[in-house]
Curated annotation (Swiss-Prot):
Coiled coil stretches, renumbered: none
Function: One of the primary rRNA binding proteins, it binds directly to 16S rRNA where it helps nucleate assembly of the platform of the 30S subunit by binding and bridging several RNA helices of the 16S rRNA. Forms an intersubunit bridge (bridge B4) with the 23S rRNA of the 50S subunit in the ribosome.
Keywords: Ribonucleoprotein, Ribosomal protein, RNA-binding, rRNA-binding
Protein name: Small ribosomal subunit protein uS15
Highest taxon listed in the record's lineage: Bacteria
Family: Belongs to the universal ribosomal protein uS15 family.
Any GO molecular function: structural constituent of ribosome
Gene responsible for this protein: rpsO
Length: 89
């Protein structure tokens, strides 16, 4: 099932830098992580859904690029974010 508007709003509230912040790398990575986790559950039941798998790979790539950007500009913020999200590295 897709990430709902309420779930997105909760993620934004949890990871925003300031009130009204929806575009910071932290928020974008957190939203992508929520969608990636949702799709990972989808693939447990729909193993042959290769079309959606391509979308998943695009999301993972976009998240990786955003994390690389964040690591270059704010290492402390990067480390905090991957720890909070439970990502490896």
């Amino acid at each position: 099932m897709a990430v709902t508007t309420d779930q997105k709003a909760q993620v934004v509230r949890d990871y925003q830098r300031a009130a009204g912040d929806t575009g910071s790398p932290e928020v974008q990575v957190a939203l992508l992580t929520a969608r990636i986790n949702d799709l990972a559950d989808h693939f447990k039941t729909h193993v042959k859904d290769h079309h959606s798998r391509r979308g998943l790979l695009r999301m993972v790539s976009r998240r990786r690029k955003l994390l690389d950007y964040l690591k270059q500009n704010s290492v402390e913020s990067y480390r905090t974010l991957i720890e909070r999200l439970g990502l490896r590295k």
